[in-house]
């Protein structure tokens, strides 16, 4: 388990319909406690992993750049430092009276979960024309779900529906003209391992919500006969026959809608990707490339710039919204680890996306994610932005120094950076263009800083900073919320101060 594994639900058949028990309790309520006593439970899971993601600008390693356009993928990857479980939030069924005291705290802790994804970008073309071409359809160089389960030790998975004499393989069609993905109908013995049946059901649900015109939605969503209902029923009955029939019906319907042009027309009218779709694609990529090798990321050095930690997709999506990142912009992640954020920017926003990482193991995994990213985007019929991942020291790599001069948004997860590294980064702000936004977990501008004659030439005088909050489940090293900063390069204040001295 690793970075995106918290997005998977627990249990072998975790997606089957549950029958919640709802109890109404009538009681005389004591006088409500004062608001100060109302509790907002904040859970902090194991603190074994250090804060922040690893980035270290020294000992620069091999300098290879991997670009999206038909080049070998060599992108930077960042994976979570520790293998921790993120339990699915428990849904409570209670009376209205009981809920009244907890609504405020619940909304505060879960606000990020209910927010929508980035604003529509009318300049972005979501659909990949190549992915919908019926000519010369060839197998994609992707890792099939069946490859994950078949390569594991035989004892790690068991048949989901029994029947030792029957084959377990099943094919799933995606919205594009690409060939189907192979899955095995098995469940993991360890609840943290890959769950192919969950993935199938999630894919069908995401496709029905994001690719299907409203006029065709009943086939998927009808509460009695819809595909999603049939899948839940098959799992509840533990019926392989019903499950295969439902998937086969889904495959036929998707192929019909694609050939009729309905899916393409729907995508062409879409100008943003919803976050659940983004999360599903990123989760698939991570599960097929990084998760099987996540142990290689366990090596880190406390007290150095090589401590590893991740910003999770919903938090990153919030950053994209706050900075108003658009498809025509340039995004740079300094210390990109296994490349998760670089890929998310290219996928969710469609912008040119860059990352730089120097930890060799993370870079190796980034290259695997890069390759899978291209194939998965094609499978889902999406045209992402160009991605460029660079190995080496982001303070010294010329390609990064050059791209920073035209960057619109720069992300620096400096939670665990040493003061020396933070100071060295500041010097690069001089070359950034006006209006460039620098997002960080620690502010580069000290609280209460004022422009004075004695610090007139400090680069931080060019920055206008605002502080924002991130909520629970936003970072990999803690469940507790915190603060982050967006610094905008704005020379007007410094110019005004200099003019006042004349």
Swiss-Prot record:
Q: What else is known?
A: In contrast to other lysine histone methyltransferases, it does not contain a SET domain, suggesting the existence of another mechanism for methylation of lysine residues of histones.
Q: Which reaction does it catalyse?
A: L-lysyl(79)-[histone H3] + 3 S-adenosyl-L-methionine = N(6),N(6),N(6)-trimethyl-L-lysyl(79)-[histone H3] + 3 S-adenosyl-L-homocysteine + 3 H(+)
Tell me the protein's name: Histone-lysine N-methyltransferase, H3 lysine-79 specific
Protein's gene:
dot1
Annotated positions binding S-adenosyl-L-methionine: 308-311, 331-340, 357, 393-394
Which stretches does UniProt call biased (Basic and acidic residues)? 57-72, 106-121
- Pfam families xrefs: DOT1
Its source organism is: Aspergillus fumigatus (strain ATCC MYA-4609 / CBS 101355 / FGSC A1100 / Af293)
For this UniProt entry, which residues form the secretion signal? none
One of the GO biological process terms: DNA repair
- Report the domain of life of the source organism: Eukaryota
Ranges for region Disordered: 1-121
């Amino acid at each position: 388990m690793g970075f995106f594994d918290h997005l998977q639900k627990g249990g072998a058949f975790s997606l089957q319909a549950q029958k919640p028990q709802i109890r109404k309790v009538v009681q005389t309520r004591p006088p409500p406690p004062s608001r100060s006593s109302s509790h907002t439970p904040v859970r902090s899971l194991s603190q074994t992993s250090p804060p922040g993601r690893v980035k270290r600008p020294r000992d620069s390693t091999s300098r290879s750049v991997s670009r999206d356009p038909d080049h070998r993928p060599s992108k930077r990857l960042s994976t979570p430092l520790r293998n921790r479980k993120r339990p699915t939030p428990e849904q409570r069924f209670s009376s209205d009276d009981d809920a009244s005291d907890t609504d405020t705290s619940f909304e505060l802790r879960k606000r990020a979960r209910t927010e929508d994804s980035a604003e529509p970008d009318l300049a972005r073309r979501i659909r990949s024309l190549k992915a919908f071409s019926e000519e010369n359809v060839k197998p994609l160089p992707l890792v099939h779900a069946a490859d994950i389960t078949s390569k594991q030790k035989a004892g790690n998975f068991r048949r989901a529906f029994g029947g030792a004499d029957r084959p377990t393989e099943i094919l799933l069609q995606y919205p594009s003209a690409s060939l189907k993905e192979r899955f095995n109908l098995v469940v993991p013995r360890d609840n943290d391992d890959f769950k192919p049946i969950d993935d199938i059901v999630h894919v069908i649900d995401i496709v029905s919500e994001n690719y299907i015109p409203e006029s065709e939605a009943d086939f998927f969503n009808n509460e009695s006969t819809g595909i999603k209902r049939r899948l839940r029923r098959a799992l509840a009955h533990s019926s392989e026959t019903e499950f295969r029939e439902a998937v086969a019906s889904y495959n036929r319907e998707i192929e019909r809608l694609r050939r009729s042009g309905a899916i393409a027309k729907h995508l062409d009218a879409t100008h943003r990707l919803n976050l659940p779709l983004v999360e599903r694609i990123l989760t698939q990529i991570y599960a097929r490339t990084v998760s099987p090798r996540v142990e290689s990321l366990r090596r880190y050095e406390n007290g150095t710039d090589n401590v590893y930690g991740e910003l999770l997709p919903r938090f990153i999506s919030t950053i994209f919204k706050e900075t108003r990142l658009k498809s025509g912009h340039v995004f740079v992640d300094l210390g990109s680890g296994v490349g998760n954020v670089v890929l998310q920017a290219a996928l969710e926003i469609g912008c040119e996306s860059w990352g730089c990482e120097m930890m060799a193991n993370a870079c190796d995994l980034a290259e695997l994610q890069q390759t899978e990213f291209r194939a998965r985007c094609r499978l889902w019929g999406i045209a992402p932005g160009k991605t460029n991942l660079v190995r080496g020291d982001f303070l010294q790599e010329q390609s990064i120094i050059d791209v920073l001069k035209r960057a619109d948004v720069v992300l620096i997860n400096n939670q665990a950076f040493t003061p020396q590294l933070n100071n060295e980064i500041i010097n690069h702000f001089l070359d950034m263009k006006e209006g460039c936004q620098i997002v960080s977990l620690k502010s580069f501008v000290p609280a209460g800083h004022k422009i004075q004659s004695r610090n007139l030439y400090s680069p931080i005088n060019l920055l206008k900073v605002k502080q924002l909050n991130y909520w629970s489940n936003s970072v990999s090293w803690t469940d507790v919320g915190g603060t982050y900063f967006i610094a905008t390069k704005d020379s007007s204040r410094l110019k005004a101060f200099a003019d006042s001295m004349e």
